[in-house]
Regions:
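Active-site core of glycosidic bond-cleaving carbohydrate-active enzymes
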Residues: 1-149, 153-154
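C-terminal beta-strand-rich structural cap/linker in extracellular carbohydrate-active enzymes
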Residues: 158-171
Length: 171
């Protein structure tokens, strides 16, 4: 689909520990993600026969192979946190929010796709993310706003210990 082998190699949010085992352990998996961010943006047009906008956007954003302009990469910066390294997630999410998004007319790094791009940004600045679909929890990042309210209640992702926030604690 719209992801490459780079992005799809990490598409296992339901078994991140198993993925880490396949890479030889947590540290090796995190090193591979470091490599993903450091790698020059490159791609093959393959069956498309031409460069499509997702390819152009990934190269323009210049976050290596993390094509934050497209859904297959949305969870990638949060893998660090899922493995217990919240600060590494916070670094990349803050950098992406500040450098890839803006309030300009073209302020999203990719197409909006029914709100997914905006919601990724909102989760990023709130400091948590629904890492695994269907699992009632969020992984932590670091909040980038002074105060936030959800359903009339103030929420503060930074006030939770550890790297996981139960869904019930926020909603």
């Amino acid at each position: 689909t719209e992801g490459s082998a780079w992005q799809n190699s990490f598409a296992v949010p339901h078994d991140i520990e198993g993925l880490a085992e396949l890479y030889g352990g947590r540290e090796q998996l995190m090193r591979k993600i470091d490599e993903l961010f450091a790698e020059k943006p490159h791609y093959e047009v393959g069956g498309y026969g031409r460069e499509i906008h997702e390819m152009t956007e990934m190269a323009a954003a210049d976050f290596g192979q993390c094509a934050i302009s497209n859904q297959p990469s949305f969870h990638i910066p949060y893998i660090y946190s899922a493995l217990g390294e919240v600060d590494r997630t916070a670094y990349w999410v803050e950098k992406l929010c500040k450098e890839a998004f803006s309030y300009a007319d073209d302020g999203f790094p990719g197409d909006e796709d029914n709100g997914t791009m905006a919601l990724w940004y909102v989760f990023g600045v709130l400091g948590f993310y629904p890492f695994c679909p269907g699992k009632p929890e969020f992984v932590k990042g670091r909040k980038q706003v002074k105060r936030a309210f959800l359903c009339g209640r103030e929420i503060d992702a930074d006030s939770f210990d550890g790297n996981i926030i139960p869904y019930s604690a926020l909603v």
